Amino acid sequence: MKDEANLTFSHNLESVSSDDGMRFQREKFCPRVERAKKFLGETIAEARVLDIGIGYGSFLNILEQDYGIQNLCGMDPFPKSLEMSKKNTSADLRQGDIDDQEWPFSKPFDLITCFDVVEHLKIPSVFFTRSARYLKPGGLVLVTTPNKTLPYHMRKLPFIGKPDLNPTHINVRVPEYWRRLALGTGYEILDEWMGEHLTHIKFVPPLLSAALDKMGLDPRNIPGLNHFQQSFCLLLRKL
């Protein structure tokens, strides 16, 4: 893949790494880590973690700074991502692609994370089968992908929809597809949720989110409304 195919960098590193930028990143990533922490327990700081598709390195920075995890690795096919992330984390960063027959690591991991990447793959099952090779027995996978439920299709509505303009989103699938894929490639599902941010259409989600916040309600926990959440998230254990 050529570097120019990476559409990740819609912001500069300075804005992402600013106080406001990192506050947004923590709101996005920390709930995911807390769910994984329930299964890793108090040993999370000693966990060996691989993040695939590292972006700006913000998630690795949070694992390092907020959770004290030092045994961190990252893999990304794009040199620009590796270059930018080195300014954000001291993790062991290596160039590699999910589709590669061999990943550039020899020691197995307790946890492999992969956020908003599998929808870019021609054959998404490759991620799950490759990850299994690099996990310790009983190791965990935390994977997220666009939440293709009914509200996702509202992106196409004129005037109020937020269209998905990323041409590399070639495998945006319904949650049941990902459940079957995980179960069929040797994992058990420990947890699943729809999370992060209300999205897909303009105006209504921000107003509704603000109203729910005032009432102390979390839209991620409200059936039906949680379908407006941006991501479908799976926490898996290798069998």
Predicted feature locations:
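Conserved N-terminal segment of class I S-adenosyl-L-methionine
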Residues: 1-107, 111, 115, 128, ...
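Short catalytic micro-motifs in class I SAM-dependent methyltransferases
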Residues: 115-122
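A short glycine-rich, Lys/Arg-flanked "PGG" loop and its adjoining helix->strand segment in the class I
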Residues: 126-137
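Conserved beta-strand signature within the Rossmann-like core of class I S-adenosyl-L-methionine
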Residues: 139-145
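Short, glycine-/aromatic-enriched active-site segment of Class I SAM-dependent methyltransferases
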Residues: 147-169
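C-terminal alpha-helical "lid/dimerization" subdomain adjacent to the S-adenosyl-L-methionine
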Residues: 165-167, 190-196
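Short alpha-helix
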Residues: 170-185
